[in-house]
Amino acid sequence: MTLATRTQPIGALGLGLIAALSATPHTGEAVQLEVTPDLVIDLTGYARGWFAMNLKDHPELGANGRPIDDKGELSMARFSTLLQLQTQLGSTNWVAIGRFSREYETGYLSNLEDASNSKGLPLNLTDRYNEDELREFYMDTSLSERLNLRLGKQQVVWGETDFFQAMDVIHGYDNSIVQFQAENEEWRKPSWLINVEYAVYELNGSLQLLVRPGIDGGSNMGNTFDLFGGRWAGQPNKGTNTLALFPYNYHHDKGDEDDPSYGGRWVGTAGSTSYTFNYYHTLQQEPILNFVANPFGDSPKNGLGEFIFPEVDIIGATASAPVFQGVWRAEAAYTPNKPYNFGLLGTPLAGAGGVKEKDTLRLMVGYDQALRSIGPRASSPPQLSLQLFDTWIVNYQRDDQIADFTARKKEHSVIGTALLTTNFRHDTISPSLVLIHDISYGGGLVIPGIEYKPGNHWRLKAEAYLFYKSKDTCSTTPFGKGLGCTHTFGTFDNNNQLVARITYQF
């Protein structure tokens, strides 16, 4: 029994980054709770501690007007417990998953709070990071030999990528607490869904229909980025609560959380190839800024600006098949009239010119392979996973001045990822190396890591996050230098850190 469920295509899916790294932990030996002789509940879960230490000083200014001196300080001391309950009532399977997290306010986090509060931008990071969440609560039942229903709060996964998403569009992600983790199911935001799947045996496939009725809270919609000045805020915004100036509006006429999302997916096989065709109407994952000077639909409620999640249509397809000694994967997701901010590039108000809609195609090609053994002490062959992502603005014009952070966005934004992992001592020691490089703008990330699995219950993992800049990417200083060339990995400048995680799973 796993701690998170997902809908996957029929046939070979490839090794993938999640399979190569540690999956959501469980022992397979659930604790059984007998409520009555006819009602037995299986309990699984974990208790986990996270710790992160800054490896560089940040240039942002503290409340005292001097740069925050935070090298060597803890940026995270987080403690989480996840519980999954599962039981069978007649022909219906019930699952409930809850997660409870608390953070110790380190000196570094206190400095970030003081810096934001001194600017008149109130910030309480403890409230931001602590959580008591019903992650999932759903029932599964078979209505007929062909028809299956899953009803409730759940995760549905379309697509086969990690770190960056192409066709995985049903849910948003919370990227404000930690980033670049392998277990997407931990950071994906589950939704209340009606999920129906009908098997078409004659065509070796199935049809899935989804409806999100619109009863989720606004914070469950779209991706959550650190826009409040915490540890994952992009440079130079640590210690600056941007949301105090530009709050979220989840009830905008261009995108309202109460409006339903809906779509469908065909999953099938043709020979050794697994494929899907997908359509989904929803709120887009990335927020955009709606400025009062040139509003996109309704003017901001605060008379200045606000973050909104406009409604979009996404049409896509995925495929995977064995090739040579491994598995190739591909995804394509087309979004007509996708909204972007534009104008005033190279200034603190980049994107304040308003919103332009551009047809956008997201593409991914990946390849996974088991390599030859690297030595007699390796207990299994090394696994290599490669991915190439491209965000293509199909009707791109340079004069549109589409904003990528504070700089100009290109027609093609291409990122490559590579993961190498292997196992020693009967799979109890698992070193790994992740490389992420921004081919279009420069910069990237190197993550060397190692995981120790001494038995069924304990998992110890350590990683280093080493960001770098190159090519066209620079970073913005607190005094505004570098605004014209700051792209994705420029915002991660000076964010190198060591991360340790200890988990007891049951």
Label each residue range with its predicted role.
Residues 27-43, 85-94, 142-150, 158, ...:
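Short loop/turn motifs that connect adjacent beta-strands in outer-membrane beta-barrel proteins
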Residues 45, 81-87, 136-141, 194-198, ...:
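Residues on the lipid-exposed face of transmembrane beta-strands in outer-membrane beta-barrel proteins
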Residues 49-55, 89-91, 100-104, 155-157, ...:
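Transmembrane beta-strands of outer-membrane beta-barrel pores
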Residues 53, 73-79, 130-135, 188-192, ...:
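Residues that define the transmembrane beta-barrel architecture of outer-membrane proteins
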Residues 64-71, 121-125, 178-182, 248-252, ...:
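Extracellular loop and loop/strand-boundary signature of outer-membrane beta-barrel proteins
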Residues 76, 88-91, 280-282, 329-339, ...:
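Detector for outer-membrane/organellar transmembrane beta-barrel domains
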Residues 87-229, 465-471:
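Outer membrane beta-barrel
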Residues 482-506:
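Outer-membrane beta-barrel "beta-signal"
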